C-alpha cells in the first residue's frame, strides 16, 4: 500500500469518503492515494502508521537541494518567521508572501509557508499593522505559521530555477552561464544551452511568451540576418549577466527584468527577450513541489492559488497605433 501524503498516526479508522478526508485530516481527497479509495463509499485504514515530521525537516529538504551558501550576498533566504521544532501539518508554496497567501495557508491547515522571494530583506524595528510586511509577520505568528524562503540559492542551484526554465523551452546541453563554488557547494548564475534546431528570432520569442503566459514581452532589435539556437537565460533580474551571454556567443538572452540602457548596443550581438520578473519565475512553485515530494512524500503540499504579481497591465491599443503612426 502506498503512503498517504499527510502526517498523522492512525491505528484503525473507518469513515465515509469525503467526510473522512475533510473532517479528520482537514483537506480534500486529492492527496489520498487511489488505492485507499478503491472500496468505494467507505475507506478503511487498518493499522496504518504514517510518521510525523518537524518543520526543520522541510527546511532541511529544501537546503539539501539548494544550500543556503549559494544565495547572493544581498539575499535573505532561509527561515523568515516562526519555529522549526513544531510538527509540520502541510506546506503552502508561493512566489511572494502576502496577506492573502498567509490566509490561504490558514484555510488549508498548513503551518509552513514556503516562498521564493523573502518576506524580510531588512530587519524590522517593530511588528504592528503599519505595513503589509508587518501584518504578514503578525498574522503568521498569531496562527503558528512558519515562513521560509528559497530565493537566489534556488536560482543558483544545479537543477534549480534557471534549469527549470531551460527545460520548459527545450534547451539541450545546459550548463551554468557563470559557474562558481561557495563554501564547497557548486552552483552558478544563469544557464546557457542550445535549441534542438535553429528558430527564427521573433518566432522563438513568441513561443517563449506562450509558454510563460507573457502578455507583453519586451525585446530589442537583434541581428535579423541569422536564426537563434544558442540561448542564455536568467530568471528574475538577470541583466548583470548580459555581458557574459555576449562573451559566450549567445544568440538570445532571456530574463525577467532589464534596465533601459542595457537594450542599447546589441543590435549586432544578440536578441534580448524580457518576460517580466513574475512571469519568468512561474514554474518555480512546481520545482519546489517536486523537491519536497521527492524528499518528503508524506508532507501535504499545495500551490498558492492567488497570483501575487503586483504589476497590472493597461492595454491601450489606440495609443499604440498613434505611436506607430508617428514613427513612420
Name the predicted role of every residue range.
Residues 44-328:
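Hydrophobic structural segments
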Residues 18-19, 35, 45-46:
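Intrinsic low-complexity/disordered segments
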Residues 25-27, 34-36:
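Low-complexity, intrinsically disordered Ser/Thr/Pro- and acidic-rich segments
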Amino acid at each position: 500500500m502506498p503512503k498517504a501524503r499527510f502526517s498523522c498516526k492512525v491505528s484503525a479508522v473507518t469513515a465515509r469518503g469525503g467526510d473522512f478526508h475533510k473532517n479528520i485530516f482537514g483537506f480534500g481527497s486529492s492527496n489520498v492515494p487511489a488505492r485507499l479509495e478503491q472500496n468505494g463509499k467507505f475507506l478503511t485504514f487498518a493499522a496504518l502508521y504514517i510518521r510525523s515530521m518537524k518543520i526543520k525537516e522541510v527546511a532541511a529538504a529544501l537546503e539539501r537541494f539548494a544550500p543556503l551558501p549559494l544565495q547572493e550576498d544581498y539575499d535573505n533566504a532561509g527561515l523568515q518567521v516562526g519555529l522549526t521544532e513544531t510538527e509540520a501539518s502541510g506546506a503552502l508554496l508561493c512566489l511572494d508572501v502576502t496577506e492573502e497567501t498567509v490566509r490561504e495557508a490558514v484555510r488549508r491547515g498548513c503551518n509552513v509557508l514556503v516562498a521564493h522571494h523573502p518576506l524580510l530583506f531588512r530587519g524590522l524595528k517593530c511588528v504592528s499593522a503599519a505595513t503589509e510586511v508587518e501584518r504578514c509577520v503578525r498574522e503568521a505568528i498569531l496562527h503558528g505559521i512558519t515562513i521560509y524562503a528559497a530565493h537566489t540559492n534556488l536560482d543558483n542551484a544545479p537543477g534549480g530555477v534557471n534549469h527549470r526554465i531551460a527545460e520548459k523551452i527545450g534547451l539541450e546541453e545546459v550548463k551554468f552561464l557563470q559557474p562558481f563554488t561557495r563554501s564547497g557547494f557548486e552552483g552558478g548564475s544563469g544557464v546557457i544551452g542550445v535549441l534542438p534546431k535553429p528558430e527564427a528570432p521573433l518566432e522563438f520569442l513568441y513561443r517563449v511568451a506562450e509558454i510563460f503566459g507573457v502578455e507583453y514581452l519586451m525585446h530589442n532589435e537583434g541581428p535579423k540576418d541569422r536564426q537563434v539556437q544558442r540561448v542564455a537565460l536568467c530568471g528574475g533580474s538577470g541583466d548583470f549577466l548580459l555581458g557574459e551571454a555576449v562573451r559566450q556567443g549567445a544568440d538570445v538572452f532571456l530574463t525577467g527584468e532589464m534596465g533601459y540602457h542595457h537594450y542599447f548596443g546589441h543590435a549586432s550581438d544578440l536578441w534580448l527577450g524580457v518576460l517580466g520578473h513574475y512571469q519568468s519565475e512561474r514554474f518555480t512553485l512546481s520545482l519546489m513541489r517536486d523537491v519536497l515530494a521527492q524528499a518528503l512524500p508524506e508532507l501535504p503540499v499545495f500551490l498558492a492559488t492567488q497570483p501575487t504579481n503586483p504589476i497590472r497591465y493597461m492595454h491601450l491599443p489606440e495609443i499604440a497605433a498613434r505611436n506607430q503612426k508617428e514613427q513612420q
